[in-house]
């Protein structure tokens, strides 16, 4: 029997859902009937995939699949426990060391997702005596993590070093100060000016934390992220990241950095303490991922070449492209309805992308976000550019 209270909330939710639908903001899941790769099957037809975070093309890599199978055969399907009770195998420690070696840090702690890593990093380390200074375009997980903490909060406009400096001046009375930024911002694809952030952190005596989710595997000479890009390896106090993007695309997050910080997170970070350990298959494939990346940076080099090829082709066609160094290419359309229509027509042309508009991006800043992968061939990139060009002319976006 339904309670009266459920009847009330049901009516309320139905009304809110109808409003979301009417505003064109209702999110529908698009069903993929193939492995995640450069070409996927959607609604019974093959399309080129340009909206996955599969930056190094590893989501269906045979070596990772085999490593996952071997780990599951040797260590089982699941852990059925949190780490500090009976959920820690030798391979969990091996993966944590591999991540620390990759980023040049002292220690690493694994989480179920990077949302948990960001959500669980602030509360154990900072109190009302401290200050967190956060970029305005940081990921939702950072925003939620900061909300869970009692520290004084400051926010500066995206990559605005003048505003950041003003925040640091205001925060001088606090005991501890930390600057928090995404390495690459997911909607524009721009990289944080980490060299200038670290210079200000040194000037005003602050810690620095970077979310490497969209920069690890992508930026830097060998793909080791934004700290490598700016020659700051080992100089950033806290890095967070994911195994769900460049590093195989499955699940799992991590925090890596100073040893004492990681040790305190093991003691008091609630998402770590109260969530099951990562399953052996994911851990085994993760270890294999970092072995592959230690052997060669061929995949990173291919990604860089693909990004350069795609951006050059799109700009030659006349599209308005946000300047970035990342694998995220924001094709600016500015109008919300146009971005939806453009994305739908591209899917008709066999190109799978997503249009983004308010409230995901600011009003008047609608765009199609293209994510390039090392798994794309030059022929696939050219097909995508040709489809964009055809639709762009049909909709009077380009001449």
Predicted regions and their residues:
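Short loop-beta-helix segment that forms the pyridoxal 5′-phosphate
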Residues: 82-88, 97-120
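Conserved PLP-anchoring active-site segment centered on the Schiff-base-forming lysine
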Residues: 121-140
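Active-site phosphate-binding strand-loop segment of PLP-dependent enzymes
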Residues: 154, 158-210
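Active-site C-terminal subdomain of aminotransferase-like
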Residues: 204-207, 214, 219-325, 338
